[in-house]
Amino acid sequence: MSLDKKKFKACMILAALGYVIGFYNCIYEFNNSNDFSINTIGDNYIIEGSHYSNYIIFDFINTCGFYNCPLPNMTISDDTIFHLSMAKALIESNENNFLANIEKNMIKEINTPDKILDMINKYRIGNVTLNSLKKLKNGDNWLKFQYKENDGGTGGCMRTMCIGLIYPNINQREKLIKLALLSTRITHNNAIAWLGAITSALFISLAINNVEPSYWIFELMSLLESSIIDNIVQENIPNDYVNYIKDKKIFVDKWKKYQQIRFDKYKFKEIKLMMMPNYRSKFYHDMFHFNNNRIYPGAGGDDSVIIAYDALLDSKDDWEKLVVYSMLHVGDSDTTGTIAGAFYGAMYGNTNISKIMTKKFNMTKELSNIGLQLYKTSIKLADK
C-alpha cells in the first residue's frame, strides 16, 4: 500500500501543536497556574485537580479557542526540539549511523551555556534528559549509564514518533523496536521509558498504514507477549535485562488493565461519562494509582501513551475533541498532547484541522519539510 506524504507532514506538525497547546507557556502543564499543593497525593489531589480541568478548558476557549490560538506567542518545548533533532538525524544519515547522529544532534542543543539556560528557563527541559546530555557532552558513554528505577518518564515516547514514520512496514518491526529502545536509553535508562517509546513508534507505524486505531492495542499486546523485545534487550544491553523484566511487568499490567476496562473482546467500549473532564481525570487516577515520584496523569512512559491513545479512540477524527481530551487536562498535558497530536496526524492527516491555526504556527513550514524528508527516507529504507 502506498503511503500518504501529507500524513507524514501532519504527524510532525500536529505533534508540535499538541505540545504547544498542552504546555501553553507552562500555564497548563502540571497546572502551574493553580494554587493547590503539588504534594497532595490521592483523592484530595484528584478532586481539586479534576475540577481545575474545567477551568483549563474554559480558559483555552476564552483565550484563543480552537481556531485563533496566539501561536506566535506560545513556546515550543525541549521535547519538540529533540524530536526535530532526532528526525534530522534520521534524514541526514544512513542506518548504521542513526544512533551516533541522534546523540550528536541532541548534544548540539546544549553545547553552550546560553543554550543550556534556554533549555532550562525557556523550554523547561526535564532533569533526567538534561543530566544525561551533560554526561554525554563531557564524554561519557551512554551504553555504560546505570539503570535508574525512577527514570521511567516520557522523554522517549515524545520523540520516537519519527521512527514510526521511517519504519512503517511489518518487516521493519525489529529495526523500529531497537532504534526506539536504544535512542531512548541515551537519556532515560528505564524499561518503562523504553517500552513507552516503542509503543509511540509502533502506533505511528500502524497509523501511517491506515490500521484502525482500535486494533493497535492488540498489535502491542501481541508484541509484548512475544520474545522480540526481550531478545533485543538481551543482545544489546544484557546488564539491564533483569531490571527490564521487572519493570516490563509494570508496563504490561497497566496496558492489560486498560484493555480490560475499555475493550469488549476486540471492540472499544465507549463510556459516555468520559466526555466529562472530572470523570476522565478520576478514571486515570483510579486506573494507574500514581507512583510517588509521578503524581500527575501522563507523566510516565506507560500512562502517557495510554492517555493519548484513549483520547484518540474517544475523539476519532474530531480534532477539537482530541484537544480537550489530550491537551487540556490535569497533569502532564503537553506530553499526552504531543503524542495524541502525532497519532492524529499520522492517522487522519489534516482532517478537520483549521488552516488558520496551522498558518499561524511559525514552525509549520519547517515541520512540513521535515515530514516530507521523513517520507522520502521511509521510501529509501523500504527499498533496502
Question: What function would you assign to each model-found segment?
Answer:
Residues 1-384:
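Structured, active/binding-site neighborhoods that engage oxygen-rich ligands
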